[in-house]
Every structure is written in C-alpha cells, then in structure tokens.
Amino acid sequence: MQIIEIREPEQTDFKQKQQIAVGIDFGTTNSLIAIATDRKVKVIKSIDDKEITPTTIDFTSNNFTIGNNKGLRSIKRLFGKTLKEILNTPALFSLVKDYLDVNSNELKLNFANRRIRICEIAAEVFIYLKNQAEEQLKTHITKAVITVPAHFNDAARGEVMLAAKIAGFEVLRLIAEPTAAAYAYGLNNNQKGCYLVYDLGGGTFDVSILNIQEGIFQVIATSGDNMLGGDDIDVVITQYLCNKFDLPNSIDTLQLAKKAKETLTYKDSFNNDNISINRQILEQLILPLVEYTINIAQECLAQAGNPNIDGVILVGGVTRIPLIKDELYKAFKVDILSDIDPDKAVVWGAALQADNLIAPHTNSLLIDVVPLSLGMELYGGIVEKIIMRNTPIPIAVVKEFTTYADNQTGIQFHILQGEREMAVDCRSLARFELKGLPPMKAGNIRAEVTFAIDADGILSVSAYEKISNTSHTIEVKPNHGIDNTEIDIMLENAYKNAQIDYTTRLLQEAIIEAEALISSIEGAMAELTTLLSESEISVINSLLDNIKAAAKARDRILINNSIKEFKSKINKSMDTNLNIIINGVLKGKNINQIQ
C-alpha cells in the first residue's frame, strides 16, 4: 500500500506570481530550500548545482562560508541551550569548545572576530539559502515556512525565528518536521489512515503518530531524541575503524566513516586502501541505535492509544540504510513508505505549506500537539491542568478563577508544565500578578484566564477581571523551554508516582476544603454572633476544633468525616440561623459549595 504516487519534478515551469514563499529545512547536518507552485515542488540548487547544503559555517578572509564542511557544524543542536547546559553536556561542549567564551555570563561564541550569539551565526545559513533562492528565481523573497524538530522547546523555536528574522525572512509558520513530511505525502492524494513518521536526520530523531482524515493532518502523539542522529552512526563507525585498523580519531577518519556508511547503504562492502568493512559489520555496529529508535517509536504509539497504523513514513537520509527498513517492518508489520527522497520530504512539506499559506487552494489542515500538560498552581500547591498533554494546537482554553481570602487586591498566577498533581513536582514556566482588584469577600472576584498556544507552539497566558477591568498578558519566555530528555523523565516520574500524587492531591484538597469552611464560618460568627445562642456557638466551635485537629494531623479520612459531621449536626440543630449566616456572608451559597 502506498500513501501517494508521486514523481519528483525535473523541469518545472514556475509561474511568476506576486507573492512567493519558500519552505526551509534547517537541518543539523544539511539544509534545503524549496518552492512550490500549484502543488509542484522544486528544490532550489546552490551555485555549485547541489540541492543539499551542509549546515556548516566557516569564517575566512572576513567572509562567512556556508556548506564547505569546515568550521562550526551541527549548530542546530545549540538552539535554545544555555551556557550552563553546554558546559555540562559533553556532546554539546565538543561542538563549540574551540569557540566558546567560558568567561561570559551568556552563551556567545568567539566567531568571526567577535563575540556572537548562536542565532546570529545560524542566520548566515538562512542568508545563504535566501540568496541562492533569489538568484535562481530572479525575485526578492521574504516569506518562509521553516521546519523544526517536534521536540524543539520554546527557547529553540524562538532562536530559529530570530535567526530567520535576522536573515530577512518573515516566518509564516514553524511546523514540525514529521508534520511537514506527512503534508508532503498526504496532499498528493486523499489518503485516510494513521501513520507513523520515523524521522532520523543527521542530528535529531523524531517520531510522530499522525491521523490523516479528509485533508486534516493531526499529530496525536510525538516523541524522539534530539541528541541522536546519523552523526552518532558516523561516530560508531569511526570508533570501529580506529580500533580495528589503528586509525587516528580524526576528521579524516570521520569522513571515511561517513563514506563507508553511504556506500554500504547500496553496496555489500566498502574498501579503501587497506580498510574493508561489509554491510553485516555495519548492521552489527548500529543495531543497538536502531533498536533504541524503534523502542521510542513503540512508546510513542502507546501514548497515542496503540492505534492500528497503516504505514511508516521514512524521513531523513539515514533511513536509506536497509537495516532500518527491515527492523521497522519486523516491529510494525506494515508498509514502509519512502516514495519521496527522504532527504527532501521535509522541505517538500514546508514548501507546499508555504504555497498554501500565501495562496490557499486546499482544505488541508496541519495540527501539532502539546508535549506536556500546561496548568496553574492553585491554593495549597495543587495543579489545575488547563491544556492537557497531546492536545492539538493551535488551541485556546478559558477558565474562571476566584479569590481565596477576603479583601484580596491581587491574584498571583503561577504557570506550570508537567503531569504531576502538585506544583512542586512540575516545571515552573512563568509567574505574574493581577493587581488593583477591588477588596471584596472571598469568591466574589472572578478572573477569566486564557491559555493560548499558537501554531508555532508559543504559549501566552492572559488574565482579565471584569469588575476592575484589570488585565495582564504574559508570553512564556523562550528560556523556560524543555527538551525531549526532560519530557521523557517527567513522563516517567508522573507514571511512577501516579498513585502517590493522586493521594497527595486528595489530601491537599481536603485540607483546603477544611480551611475554607473554618474561615467562612468563623468570619460569619464574628459578624453575626447575636443570631446564635451560646450553646449553638459552643457546638459550632467544638465541631470546628475537630476539623482543625484532623487537618493538622493531615488525615484525609478524618478530615472528610469531621466535615461530614459538621454539616450533619449543623443542618439538624440550627438550620435556620446558620442559613441566615451563610446567605449573609456567602451570598447565596450553601455549605456544600464552600471551596
């Protein structure tokens, strides 16, 4: 079974039109730029007639040189990283050790005779691609759709957008690479079904489960490893060559390993001088890495509810290795789809989406998902989840919150990310305060809170209080992002601690209910003691003391029983007078509504 039947265009006449938008695949190892017109895609070649440009940046003779396989490489791995993260991650530190300014308080590299940010260096790649496109198409280009790994955090996405902006691009949309690949396949026919996109690039691995129904592409689950790719396979082969043939661990040996990998993709053996390696050895060397990626894919499928998949879509040049196709078939027993050149599938999708955004001619819709739940901290440290994990984006959710104490003139908002039940166990994203609220009884102030995630995965939170007409909006800053490794750890911790978290939340909710009840009743009694007899006051105080003792003991069953006893005895012995108190203080609420 095939998703599409498609041929790569050889010579395509692209009509000149008023608006032009390109698709860009800014890859860890290689980058591509393409344009689409009427669903026909053309990958734009460089001056040396190559469609694929190595993502390397060199600086010589006061000029930047892109794509000569010298200088700084794999810069994509650095997007969204802090100086501390790079210093503490050997794989990242090795990329920039010759350029890193370790005495700086921020991440800057000593590059091009100055201290320069990562986004400024990456912008040179975008400038190069932009110049190539303008030269080939003989027109000015400013609009682009750019692809990013599915697990790029806000920090990384922000740096991609900034780099593109520095290069002179207006970014129409950031789309996940697996989503772009599915777009490239799906738009060419009206296929329905569920597909696993297996994207193994030079430096990142992404897997997505996509539901394709009548032009709608919905990512229902994502996973991956943003520190794994074809580069790691090159390292494994390099280590083998060094050990087996006593070669130095050098750039030349690494290049030899790359050549061996590429040759063994379509041949059974590779020979170079006195060095020989066959496909069987290659497969033995890389099998653990391949199995690791398949385990991630299977876990992603489980997250999506284990739907029946109709095929696996291959993305990334590394997927040409026969072992990968064989192992994927063994694992999933479905067709392995690779009709489009796996190096170009992502940029095809980006170009098609760019064309659609400037001249919509299709009903197709791309939907990515939220990788971790987003919510707010409530009184007592409880997390109220507002946007759940794997919710399709863009999305906006509105909820109403109220004050906990009397005469509050401000509400503090703590935005959280994670699957745990208590704020202390989740990741803090941002804090802000809604100030200038009128002093009123607890529960009378209502704040309308909106969580919104745009198509680029950027979160903004706004709060609005109607009585005072007070509002506040915050966009989560990029340095609050989270990478794929942290996502996996957080999900694992949430799973392991699910029962404990649930019990802790129930206890905290019981304590909060007890405190609210005590505060409300004591406040009412202080204002309206003349309505109650001494014996009634004594009974109420005794019952409240029981609730206080249970809350202090942090015994949920005891708390619930003491509250139940309070309600039962109060309703039986002093229903009329207590109702007067409650109606006067809580304005229409009965005791069961006190929160």
UniProtKB/Swiss-Prot annotation:
Biological processes, Gene Ontology terms: iron-sulfur cluster assembly
Highest taxon, organism lineage: Bacteria
Keyword Cytoplasm: no
Pfam families linked to this entry: HSP70
Keyword Mitochondrion annotated: no
Any one GO molecular function term: ATP hydrolysis activity
Gene3D superfamilies: 1.20.1270.10, 3.30.420.40, Actin, Chain A, domain 4 (3.90.640.10), Substrate Binding Domain Of DNAk, Chain A, domain 1 (2.60.34.10)
Annotated keywords: ATP-binding, Chaperone, Nucleotide-binding
Entry-linked PANTHER family: HEAT SHOCK PROTEIN 70KDA
Function: Chaperone involved in the maturation of iron-sulfur cluster-containing proteins. Has a low intrinsic ATPase activity which is markedly stimulated by HscB.
Family: Belongs to the heat shock protein 70 family.
Name of the protein in its database record: Chaperone protein HscA homolog
Gene that this polypeptide is encoded by: hscA
